[in-house]
């Protein structure tokens, strides 16, 4: 089951999914977030495999070519949020000290598709909170204005600005090498964060 919670003419959307079995192409609109609330989803995005477990999410944009697979005895629940390119552009331009470089990074084929954990990002708290409100049926009041999507865009840009700044400082000849080294650094940071919180 894929249930649309909210959609508007500006291409902002929130959907809640609940599947045991699924294999389908998975489009990202504007800047899209796929959050796993229960179970595990496997994404193949731009030729790379991501196991997205409960509490994790993946971010992509319109250039991200993706396939999702779910194969579980228990229901796998997910939250899909699309934030329009216009909102991302507006918020990125406000935060970008280097002209349009951050906006270009976020909305082009240069975007760094990756899996993140809600505990380690600005966006994570919002995703967890939205999911809880949807499950308890108290979410509709938050959708009176576009403020929610601007707030989510702010969180994404806070997180992705860190990624952008560090990724552009890596100086390997191939972009793929920069991305793999940075993924390894992020994974090491995640392991350290998990050990500290134990």
Question: What spans do the regions from the language model cover?
Answer:
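A short, Lys/Arg-enriched amphipathic alpha-helix from helix-turn-helix/homeodomain DNA-binding modules
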Residues: 118-124, 128, 146, 165-198
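Short, conserved glycine- and acidic-residue-centered signature motifs
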Residues: 29, 151, 181
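Amphipathic alpha-helical segments enriched in hydrophobic/aromatic residues interleaved with Lys/Arg
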Residues: 99-163
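A short, mixed-charge helix-start or loop-turn motif at secondary-structure junctions
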Residues: 20-22, 112, 170-174
């Amino acid at each position: 089951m894929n249930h649309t919670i909210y959609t508007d003419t500006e291409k902002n959307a929130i959907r809640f999914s609940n599947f045991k079995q699924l294999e389908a192409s998975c489009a990202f609109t504007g800047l899209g977030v796929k959050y796993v609330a229960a179970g595990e989803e496997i994404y193949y995005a731009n030729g790379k495999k991501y196991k997205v477990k409960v509490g994790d999410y993946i971010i992509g944009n319109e250039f991200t070519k993706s396939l999702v697979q779910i194969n579980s005895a228990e229901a796998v629940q997910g939250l899909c949020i699309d934030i329009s390119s216009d909102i991302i552009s507006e918020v990125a331009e406000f935060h970008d000290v280097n002209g349009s470089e951050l906006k270009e990074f976020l909305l082009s084929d240069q975007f760094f598709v990756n899996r993140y954990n809600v505990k380690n990002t600005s966006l994570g708290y919002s995703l967890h909170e939205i999911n809880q409100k949807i499950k308890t049926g108290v979410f509709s009041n938050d959708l009176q204005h576009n403020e929610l999507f601007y707030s989510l865009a702010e969180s994404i840009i806070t997180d992705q600005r860190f990624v952008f700044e560090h990724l552009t400082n890596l100086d390997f000849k191939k972009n793929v090498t920069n991305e793999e080294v940075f993924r390894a650094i992020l994974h090491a940071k995640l392991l350290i964060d998990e050990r500290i919180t134990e």
